[in-house]
Each structure stands twice: as C-alpha cells, then as structure tokens.
Curated annotation (Swiss-Prot):
Residues holding ATP: 60-67
The organism's taxonomic lineage, starting at the top: Bacteria, Bacillati, Bacillota, Bacilli, Lactobacillales
PROSITE patterns: UVRD_HELICASE_ATP_BIND, UVRD_HELICASE_CTER
Gene, per the UniProt record: addA
Protein name (record): ATP-dependent helicase/nuclease subunit A
Xref: NCBIfam families: addA_Gpos
UniProt xrefs under Pfam families: PDDEXK_1, UvrD-helicase, UvrD_C
C-alpha cells in the first residue's frame, strides 16, 4: 500500500498487486505460449522479469533481449509499489545508463496513458519525476555520491574532483616516484634495492622499466577489494608458497601426467594404422615399432606409478627420463603424413625443465621482492597523500573510499541495505573484485539481480574478472538456496545463417579450459522467431583469405596491421552488396581488434569512393598543427625569449614571416653581447639599432611593429584575464580560428582549437591559475609521452562504420566484416619480466649469477634470466586467460551481425592444410591445438579442416591477385540526383550554372594540386616530413658525381668581432675533414692536423674539433679500420637527387641530399653517416635518423641496383666515438 494526497488534502490509499508466486509465473508462461501474439516473450524472459525474493543471475546470450528484461522487471517493480528511487541499477557505461533511463521513461509515459485509475496516474507521474534522481548509472557515479555525502566519516572532503586525464595522473605519479626512489637509494637496504632495480632495468640510471613495474603493480592492486591488504598478504603469496618441488600445484602435475598418457595413446593409435609397418618383410617386429612400443609402455607405467616411482620430490628426475625417452622431434610419419604425436608433451616438458636449478636460485630473489613490496606500498600511500592534498582522485580511489565508508560505518551500510529493495547490475561479467565488494555491501544478501554473459567478458585489461560471474553461476546451480540461475538463449537479433555459424564455431572451440565456459546446448544460440529461420543462401558466412603464396615479402606483417590486398577484398564485397543488393553503406560495419594502424582502410576506401566513418586512432591532439601553433603562441606570451616558440609563432599563418625575414632579423644582434635572443634582435631591428639596420626594409618593419604591438597586448591581457578569454582573444585578433576553417579537415581543426580553450578553462577551474602553470602542465604531459584525448566531430550518417570489437559490444549491424583475422594475438604480457595474479601475487624473471654453478673462474659474473616457479605458474594462467578473452572477442564480433558475417584474412593456400589428424577427436579441438593457434583465422581453418565432414555454415575461399584488379573489384553505381540538361530539375539560370561549374572546376584543380602548391620544387631529407614519406613514390634517382657539383656553399660574412662556434659549424667541419682525410696514410694527430689545414672553416671551429676522438674512431673501432682496409671501395660526401611524385597531384619534385660515406662492393653496399649531436642514449639518435638513412639507402639501391646490407651511424657527440647499426 502507498498513501498519496488528493487535491482536497485527503489521503488516498493505493493497493498494489503482490509479487507473483512461482505457480503464478508458470501460469503466465503457459498463457504466453498459447497466445496469438506475433512477438511472444519466452518462458525464461517471463521468469527473469517476475521472479522475486531471492538472488537471481540471468545468463543472457547475445541478442536475447536482456535490456528488455531489465526494463520490464523495473516497470513491474514500480507497478507493484516499489518506488524507482528504491532500486539500485548499475550499468557498465554512462551511455548505457542514459539509454536505460530513456526506456524506463517511455514505459512510464505509456503506462500513464493506458491507466484509467487516477491514483495510479498520480503515482506513476511521481515515479516519472523521480526518475532523474534515481540511482541509475555506473558504479563510479554511485561511489561519488556516497563519498560526497559521507566522506567526512573517513576524513575525505566532499569538495573533490576526479582526475580523468591520464596525463595529469602520470605527472603526479612521476613526482611521487622520483622522490621515493631517491629515499630508497639512500636507505639502509640500498644494496638490495639497487639489485632489485638492476634486475628489471639493467642499471640504476635508467629507471623506466622499474617505474613501469611499480605503476603496474599499483594499478593492479587498485582493482582488488582492499589494495593495502592485497599488497601485504597476497603480493608475495606464490613467492612464499612455491619454494620446493613439493610445492608445485597438483593440477600442474596432473596436466603433465595427462600429456604423457595422451602421448602414449596417440602413439598407440598411430602404430595401429594399416600403413604404419609393424612388421618387417621377414615377419618380425620392425625397429621403429619396437621403439614406439617401449615409449608407450614406459610412459603408461610412469603415469600409473608416479607417486611410488617419483613423487613431487622426484619430478626433476621424471622430466629427465621422459626427455631421454621420446624423440626430439614432434612428428611420427606414416605414408608421408605427419602426426604431431609428441608436440604437446614437449611443450609440457619445457615448462618443467631445469626446475632444480631454478629453485636453487629462486630463494635469492625473495629479498628483492620484499623491497619491491615495501616500495609499492610506500608509493601507494605517498601517491594517495598527494591526491588527498590536491583533493583530486582517480575513480578507483573513490570506489575504495565508498567501500571503506560502508565497511567502517554499520549505520550507513544498514541504511543503504534497508533502503534498496533490489540491487540490479547490468554487464555483470565485466565486474572486478572492487566493484563486487561494493555490491555485496549494498545488498541485504538476497536481493541481487545480475544480468550478463560470460561469453562476452572482454575487459580483462580493466581488471574485469569473468570468474566472478562463473563462480556465481556454479554456486547458484549447486546451492539453489543461495540464488537462481536463469538462461536466456533465444536470440532475436540475427538470422539463422549467423546463429548457425556461431554455434558451429564455438561448440568446437570454447570450454572451461579456454573460454571459461563450456559452449554446450544450454549456451548455444536459438532463433527467437520463425522469421529468423527463413534460409538465405547468399548470406552464408564467408572466410575470405588473400592467398599469400606469391607474396613478395613486402606486405605488412601481422603486427603491422591489415594489408592492402585484404582491404581490397572488403571493398570488392561492399561494392557488390551496394550495387547488386542495394545495401546502404550504414548497414555495413568493419570490426578490427585495435584502433591503430587502420589508415590503409580509409585510404583504400577513398580510392574506391566508399564513405567510411572511423572510430579514431591514437591520441595526437597536442601534436596537431593548429594546437602546436597555439601552444607556441602561449609559450611566447609567457616568455618571449623562448626562441623556439617565438620562431614557430612568427612562421605561423598568424604573422607569416618567411625564411628571408628571419635571416634579416637574426643579423640584428648586439656586437657586444655573446648571447642574444631573437626577441632582443626584433626590438633592435624596430628602432634601427641592430648590427645591420640596412637589411630591415619598410615592409618587414611594418610586420615587426604589428607583431610587437599584438604580442604586447596579449601579454598585458594574460596578466588580467582568464586563459579561456586570452585564447579567444588570440583567435579573434589574428583570425586564426577562421583561418583553419579554410584548411584540410577544417571541422576537426576548429574542434581542436575550441577544445583547447575549454581545457584551459577546466584547468583554471581545477584550482590552478596562470599561463605559466598551464604551459608547465602541457609540457609535463608531453615529457611523459602522453597526449590529451582527441576531439570528436560529427560524422556522416550514410557511411560504412569502422570500429573496434570492444566498441561494437551491445550494438548490432546487418552486415559485419571481421578484419585482420590473420593478426596474431598480443602475447606481450606473458613475455614481460614480471606477471601479476590476483591469487598468487607477483612472479618475476630473476637475473641469477650462475658463475659458481658453472665453475667459471675467469669472468666476474655469468648472468642468466630465470623464470621462477611463481612466474611460470602465473604465465600459464595468463596465457589461458588471454586466449580465453580472444575467443570471447571473436564471439562478440560474430554475434553483432544480423544478416551476414565475413571473416577477412591472409594465408598461404599451400600451407593451410594438414593442421591435425581429425579421426580421433571429439566435439572440441584438442586443448593443445587451441593453445597453439594464435589467430582467429587459425582457429577457423582448424575447425574447417578437422570437422570437414560437418556443415560448419561457413565457406573458406582464397582470393588471388587476379580477383583484385580494378575491373574485378568494380566501381560504385552512384545515381545522378539532377539531370544537368533539365532546367526544370536544376531550377537555376545558365549564368549561375556556369559560375558553379567554374567554381567546382577551380576547387577540384586546387584539391588535385594542393600538395604541389605547398611543396617546393627541391627539398632536402631533413625538410621532408616523416609522416608524408610513406605516401611518396620514388620513380627516379641519380647519385651526382663530385665533379658535377655546380653550386658552392655561400657563407655570409661575419660582422661580429667575436665568432660564436655553433654545433652546426662543428658538424660541417667534421664532414669536410672526413672527406679530405688521406686514408692511405696512418691516421694519427699529424695526419689529422695536415688534413685540417685543407678544410674551409675558421680557426675557432677548427680548434673546437676533437681530433683525439676522430683518431680514436679510426684506431679503436672496427668500422674505422674498415675505412682504411677498403678505402678503394669508399665514396665520400656523395650528393644525390631523387625524383619524387606527389601522390595527390602527381606533380614531380626533386629531393636532394649528401651521403657522408658508402662502400660499393660487387654485390652489396655499406652506408655510413656521421653525427655530432649531443645525446644521452645512442637509441635516441638511432630513432631520430632512421628514416634519413632509409632514404639514403633507397637512393643507393635505385642507382646501383644493389642492396644496402649495413647502415651505420658514427656518433661523435659523446665522450668517445660510438658505432650504432641502424
């Protein structure tokens, strides 16, 4: 009953219907079954909507209407007197919460319209009004409410903010880490700590690897119920437990013995084959058969009598015995067919090899792990203290605060438990243990309603644990008093062609070992309506593979993304769908595994005129041109003496100074000053007091005056106004916001600039003030190699969608293409130097010194990286968890399709057969095979091969190059909307039509030649942008002989009294010296001094050259000696020119440069380049100049038709010469 007040102020009593009993629910199910409704609710849906009074876990397969069930259940609760504000409803995303709220709102409006009872109308209207304040949202949002309201109980201010920007978090983390690292390096246990750092970083100076370890441990701990307790009690769990052979888990031993027995059984099956050849011609046993029988008997005996023959203590001996018994190869060949009998056993033996040695040294790493535990605990506390001081927290902090409030305050916890009639959770399979703890605290123990599908758990990278769902599933099935499991199997989304192929694939692929759930009848998809079962032969699933048999090896590898040929296959199929079946582009979606390296898809689709909307890529907001210009503008306003920022601002479209202008300004220095910044030179140029005032002409003087006046006004405004207003003042004063509107990707550029102003505003609202602080924050973000989130702009609606599988979850599309099926799963995590596990804690690779073990006496140490027992244990679990999630990703991708699913990949047709022997397998692919295969494509091909006698509901087709010609792919048929010859259609005069035609022609011409407009005729390698290089196509190249050089370098005269030696002058002098140095003579100081006299440089530069370093290069390095040995093959300072083609306009331009040195042999070339840059690590220069050397190599190869086999950088900017092979 519920009391409301009527218009006279009198109480109105509303009598609500009671909740349905199990018998009433069965009666309702029967009525629904017998009804003549076109769309009936299933019996399981009815059970999930109306069952009450206990915990309920709804396992909802893809497309089974779980959102419909949740909305109907919520509405039923409301109609039975449960106010909407007494329901806790958790969703995985804010978007899902908004959609759910809208659906409930529509249902309430509909119910109000249908209800004739005035009292019920008033009640439902109140529910509608309360909907906005109801607890429908993410767990993060709810935790914020709890902390805002009760944070005082644990000492947390209600006036906190959320640090959503990872860059801001990293800046704070870096500050805390650096301070803590210094403290630990100076503590009593510093030697142990240094050993810890060296174990992961190699040396104490480079802390990046150790820092990453600490950050990962911290982040992992935050997903647990209580990070501090986990770090104290679980972090070293495996390290403490697994120290002897006897500590190895029984499960691992069982798997080894099972592999041994399976090997014996498979070998017996092979020996029983008719063509095996058990007997010789004489009728006696063949030697091969005798050997195999011995293996079978011994393996079976050792498995049966393991405990008495070996036991855990003798495990190392068993491994040696088995290794010595079986052959080193994997296969047994019968009639030219290879059977991988021993493959699985070899993999298991590898896991257990060298156990005694590992355990001997493993104990030495325990003190290191204790130091790591102390450091991570200290880091967690210090980082939290900084966040408390700033009153800025991460989402995980807020959730832990909420948990702490509920755990430590019984009255608060009970008030929530009494308030909520039911605790409802959507996407339950993606919860982590922290969220599970919060839900447990809110529930009274028997009022939880959880909806999810373990087959769609794909957020392990967010520490989601599908075992939470799995454990509930098992517990509720075994102990019905704890809760009830309801299965929603009917799919209302997809046609039978999609459902059948999904069932066929996963019934052969997914079980508890890989996938975390057995894909049996209770998990298989069933069509929810008759219309879905109508067959369409042309919608049968397709596995389309580009045949790579003729691949020249230049195509991208799996790690580099999808190939051009694969994208062309997709384009061909889309053109066919669009032209032949009239399928609109928006009905087609491409699914990829990651957001990166998808540019080739957009590029290829543009070629074929197929519109596409992408899901974005890597974050490059701060690196966009328009944002970089604005940041340099702000840096200049803050400090005009920052030459780099000032030059960028002057060269920007806002002021448009060119190279000649800057050169004239640069000469206006003060002769009495050694160091003179560009800003001072500008001021002197304006008043005519520079060293060369005659170079400043009237036009340049006018530009300088405008610049100084504008900069002065900006600097004055920066002291008075907000950052937001300053940025808009810059936009308006120099029309920069309008300017970018005329450039390519105008909408994106304007959105980026607008976002910069908003972010500056948000920055100041966060408590930080001033231009200096904002610039410092941005620079720290860039220093930590982070970026800010990209800005989204409105996308066209009639276009093909490209998105990640993760992004597609919860969505549906008529036609789905799953791309890059040949891409290998990322196994990076299982090869790291450490692996974390919630139960076992950390396992590490230990860098052990085995000098004593080897009896080595000459070397100081012999270091070997060992996988400790905890590491091996975590590694095996992580590998299976990774494969399981990849399997679930494939399930999510396939079940997005409504009508048809395509798989796109690349494989060698000649090598794709013979995956395994099909005759001895059950329903599933063998576990060893599923573990071994590491791509979607391999799984599908294995299923197609092994179960070839079944109808698997998908076809495998190899696509040849001949199928991908322009004629074969075809062109889009685009209907002409207006007939240009029909004036009734056009409704415009001839004059206007001609004008529009002319404008269109000019626009097209500019578009075609845009790159040519902006590209100069001649460029140098250092000027060529790295991002543009892959698009350019070399068509001609020539190495210019030294005698053909017609232009000599022109050097401006020195007007100053004292010449400053620039780094570039030293570099030029070194190159000249290396060019004239006579290599036929011994290289010593005298030889170098003689050569030095021949070069064209002033005495200050010659004095600055480090001749000892040059002598050391020739005398102490193998490359220097190579110069002298093969001097007849050496060419020095060779100019080159490459003719390049702009990919858009097809305009040609010349790229020129000079190659420092190369050796030309009969069959190959060796390339050498000298660098005088200062550096900390050689890898910095290697990355910086890699593309430049690739360009030089390209020039040499084009000229001589020989490969460049070696490329060297000679680094002269350090303490001694270093040689780096690129």
């Amino acid at each position: 009953m519920l009391f409301n007040i009527n218009e006279k102020g009198e109480p109105l009593v509303i009598s609500f219907a009671p909740f349905l009993s199990p018998e009433a629910i069965k009666h309702l199910q029967e009525n629904e079954r017998c009804s003549d409704q076109s769309q009936k609710r299933t019996a399981q849906q009815i059970e999930a909507i109306y069952t009450s009074g206990q915990n309920i876990l709804v396992s909802a397969s893809a497309g089974s209407g779980k959102t419909f069930v949740m909305v109907e259940r919520i509405l039923d609760k409301i109609l039975r007197g449960v106010s909407i504000d007494r329901l806790f409803i958790s969703t995985f995303t804010v978007k899902a919460a908004t959609e759910l709220r809208e659906r409930i709102e529509n249902k309430l409006y509909s119910q109000i319209a249908q209800t004739t009872d005035f009292q019920m109308k008033v009640y439902l209207t109140e529910q509608l009004q309360s909907l906005g304040q109801a607890d429908i949202g993410t767990m993060d949002a709810f935790a914020q409410k709890v902390v805002s309201r009760y944070g005082y109980s644990i000492g947390i201010s209600s006036q906190f903010r959320i640090m959503q920007d990872k860059a801001e978090q990293d800046v704070l983390k870096q500050e805390v880490f650096s301070k803590l690292f210094s403290e630990f390096m100076n503590q009593k246990e510093a030697p142990v700590f240094r050993a810890l750092v060296k174990n992961f970083s190699g040396n104490c100076k480079d802390t990046s690897a150790f820092r990453e370890l600490v950050y990962t441990c911290y982040s992992f701990s935050q997903s647990t119920e209580n990070p501090k307790i986990w770090l104290q009690e679980n972090f070293l769990s495996a390290a403490k437990t697994y120290q002897r052979l006897e500590d190895i888990p029984d499960h691992d031993i069982e798997l080894l013995l099972l592999a041994m027995q399976d090997t014996a059984n498979q070998l017996r099956d092979v020996t029983d084959m008719e063509d095996y050849g058990q007997l010789t011609k004489a009728g006696s046993r063949s030697a091969k058969y005798t050997k195999h029988l011995t293996i079978i008997e011994k393996l079976s005996d050792w498995v049966r009598d393991f405990k008495c023959l070996y036991g855990k203590a003798g495990l190392d001996r068993l491994i040696r015995d088995v290794t010595g018994l079986i052959p080193s190869g994997n296969d047994v060949t019968v009639s030219k067919v290879k059977y991988p009998v021993f493959k699985t056993l070899h993999q298991k033996l590898k896991q257990f090899r060298h156990l005694e040695t590992i355990l001997m040294y493993q104990k030495d790493c325990f003190p290191l792990l204790e130091q790591l535990q102390d450091f991570v605990l200290a880091f967690s506390e210090a980082y939290l203290a900084v966040k408390i001081q700033e009153s800025a927290f991460e989402f995980s902090d807020i959730t832990h605060f909420a948990i702490k409030i509920l755990e430590e305050n019984t009255d608060i916890r009970q008030s929530y438990q009494q308030h909520y009639h039911e605790v409802m959770v959507d996407e339950y399979q993606d919860n982590n243990h922290m969220q599970e703890r919060l839900l447990t605290l809110l529930s009274n123990g028997h009022n939880r309603f959880m909806v999810g599908d373990i087959k769609q758990s794909i957020y392990r990278f967010r520490q989601a644990d599908p075992q939470i769902f799995n454990q509930k599933f098992r517990d509720y099935q075994k102990k019905t008093e704890q809760g009830k499991v309801i299965l929603l199997k009917e799919n209302f989304r997809s046609q039978s062609e999609v459902l059948n192929v999904s069932n066929a694939v996963f019934s052969h692929l997914m079980d508890e070992s890989v996938g975390d759930v057995l894909y049996d009848e209770q998990h298989q998809l069933i069509a929810g309506s008759h219309a879905q079962t109508v067959p369409y032969l042309d919608r049968r699933a397709q596995l389309l593979l580009y045949n790579s048999d003729k691949d020249d090896g230049n195509a991208p590898s799996d790690s580099e993304g999808i190939s051009f040929s694969e994208v062309t296959i997709v384009a061909k199929e889309i053109i066919k769908l669009h032209n032949d079946k009239g399928v609109p582009f928006e009905d087609i979606t491409l699914l990829v595994s990651s957001r990166t390296r998808n540019d080739i898809i957009s590029h290829t689709f543009n070629q074929y005129g197929i519109p596409i909307v992408t899901d974005g890529g890597q974050q490059n907001y701060l690196k966009s041109v328009e944002v970089m210009v604005m940041l340099d503008t702000l840096r200049t306003i803050n400090n005009p003496r920052n030459d780099y920022a000032l030059v960028a601002l002057l060269r920007s479209p806002m002021f448009a100074f060119d190279e000649d202008d800057l050169a004239r300004i640069a000469l206006q220095k003060d002769n009495e000053l050694d160091k003179d910044c560009l800003y001072d030179k500008i001021q002197r140029a304006v008043i005519g007091r520079g060293a060369h005032p005659e170079l400043i002409h009237d036009t340049l003087l006018g530009k300088l005056n405008i610049f100084l006046k504008t900069l002065k006004s900006w600097r004055r405004y920066a002291k008075l106004g907000s950052l937001y207003d300053l940025i808009w003042k810059i936009f308006n004063d120099r029309f920069y916001f309008d300017f970018v509107a005329s450039q390519a990707k105008a909408e994106q550029a304007q959105a980026n600039l607008y976002a910069l102003a908003l972010r500056a505003n948000q920055f100041e609202k966060s408590g930080y003030k001033g231009l200096y602080c904002f610039i410092k924050m941005i620079d720290k973000v860039l220093e930590t190699q982070n970026d800010l989130a990209d800005v989204e702009v409105a996308a066209p609606k009639q276009a093909v969608n490209l998105m990640t599988i993760h992004k597609s979850k919860g969505l549906q599309f008529p036609y789905v293409f799953i791309l890059n099926c040949d891409k290998r799963f990322s196994m990076t995590d299982i090869h790291k130097s450490f692996i974390l596990n919630r139960q076992h804690g950390i396992g590490i690779k230990y860098l052990a010194d085995i000098k004593v073990l080897l009896g080595e006496t000459t070397l100081n140490s012999v270091k070997v990286s060992m996988e400790t027992l905890p590491y091996q244990l975590n590694k095996q679990e992580l590998r299976l968890a990774t494969l399981s999630e990849q399997m679930r990703l494939l399930y999510v991708a396939m079940t997005r399709a409504e009508k048809k699913v395509y798989f796109i990949g690349k494989a060698s047709k000649s090598k794709s057969q013979d995956i395994t022997d099909p005759k001895k397998l059950g329903k599933l692919l063998p576990l060893a095979l599923r573990e071994q295969l590491l791509t979607f494509q391999d799984w599908l091909l294995a299923i197609a091969d092994v179960f070839s006698t079944e109808d698997l509901y998908f076809d495998v087709r190899f696509i040849e190059d001949s199928d991908l010609t322009q004629e074969s792919v075809g062109r889009l048929q685009t209907p002409q909307l207006l007939n240009p010859d029909d004036l009734k259609d056009n409704r415009q005069s001839e004059t206007i039509a001609r004008a529009l035609d002319m404008l269109e022609a000019v626009s097209q011409l500019n578009a075609n030649y845009e790159a040519a407009i902006h590209l100069p005729t001649v460029r140098t390698p250092s000027q060529l942008k790295a991002a543009y290089e892959p698009l350019l196509e070399p068509i001609g190249v020539d190495i210019i002989e030294k005698s053909s050089r017609s232009l000599s370098d022109f050097t401006l005269p020195h007007f100053s009294k004292k010449v400053k030696v620039e780094a570039s002058h030293i570099g030029s002098a070194l190159h000249q010296l290396m060019q004239v140095l006579p290599l036929s003579k011994p290289i010593n100081q005298q030889t170098l001094l003689d050569a030095l006299r021949e070069i064209d440089s002033n005495e200050e530069v010659k004095t600055a050259l480090d001749l000892k370093k040059i002598e050391s290069f020739f005398c102490d390095t193998s490359l220097g000696q190579f110069f002298q040995t093969y001097q007849k093959h050496l060419y020095r300072e060779a100019p080159f020119a490459i003719l390049k083609v702009d990919p858009i306009s097809q305009e040609e331009y010349v790229l020129r440069g000079i190659i420092d040195a190369y050796f030309l042999f009969d069959d190959h070339i060796v390339l050498v380049d000298y660098k005088t840059d200062k550096y900390k690590q050689p890898i910095e220069l290697k990355k910086r100049y890699q593309q430049q050397l690739e360009l030089y190599a390209e020039a040499l190869t084009q000229t001589y038709k020989l490969p460049v086999t070696k490329r060297y950088l000679v680094l002269m900017g350090g303490g001694k010469p270093e040689i780096v092979e690129v």
